[in-house]
Curated annotation (Swiss-Prot):
Belongs to the HMGB family. GO terms for cellular component: chromosome; nucleus. Keywords: Chromosome, DNA-binding, Nucleus, Repeat. The lineage of its organism: Eukaryota, Metazoa, Chordata, Craniata, Vertebrata. The keyword NAD does not apply. Residues 80-100 are annotated as: Disordered. It holds the Pfam family HMG_box_2. The keyword Nucleus applies. This is High mobility group protein B4. Residues 9-79, 93-161 bind DNA. It is found in: Nucleus; Chromosome.
């Protein structure tokens, strides 16, 4: 993960957290020598939160709204580090689809044709229901095809890794010989 960004604005706090911080400070003032464990303190705090009036809760909710507005304002002005996405090697073999995805590909057009106003999500849910109600005999061709594709993928992956190791080895050898000269 690395270091946290020190300039990033602090996240907004809920009304309950504002209440809890206030309750803790009051409790320490009233009973400075008393120690409460986290579990016991949380229990007392939640009991108190449930017992206070809506009027009192409104004060904490207003504080939470102000804090939320502050956070949103600071985030609009904040320009953080952009995380670089690791680029995928275009020569690397792609993972094969599962038996369900193969089934979905075959039935997508039919479902979309029957229900043209459905979104992709709705079609996918319907395909999932169809898959779960399909018997094993109908699933078998998809599972066999997926197994073949998976075996082919593992072979390609092994060849790709060996090829990458070969490139690294050649690079190291050429670097060593250039250093000797």
């Amino acid at each position: 993960m690395g270091e946290k960004d020190q300039l990033r604005p602090k996240v907004n706090v809920s009304s309950y957290i504002h209440f809890m911080l206030n309750f803790r400070n009051k409790f320490k003032e009233q009973q400075p020598n008393t120690y409460l464990g986290f579990k016991e303190f949380s229990r007392k705090c939640s009991e108190k939160w449930r017992s206070i009036s809506k009027h009192e809760k409104a004060k904490y909710e207003a504080l939470a709204e102000l804090d939320k507005a502050r956070y949103q304002q600071e985030m609009m002005n904040y320009i953080g580090k952009r995380r670089k996405r690791r680029k995928r090697d275009p020569k690397a073999p792609r993972k094969p689809p599962s038996s369900f995805l193969l089934f979905s590909r075959d039935h997508y057009a039919m479902l979309k044709q029957e229900n043209p106003d459905w979104t992709v999500v709705q079609v996918a849910k319907a395909a999932g229901k169809m898959w779960s109600t399909t018997d094993e005999a109908e699933k078998k061709p998809y599972e066999q095809k997926a197994a073949l594709m998976r075996a082919k993928y593992f072979e390609e992956q092994e060849a790709y890794r060996n090829q990458c190791q070969g490139r690294k080895g050649n690079f190291l050898e050429s670097a060593k010989t250039s250093l000797k000269q």
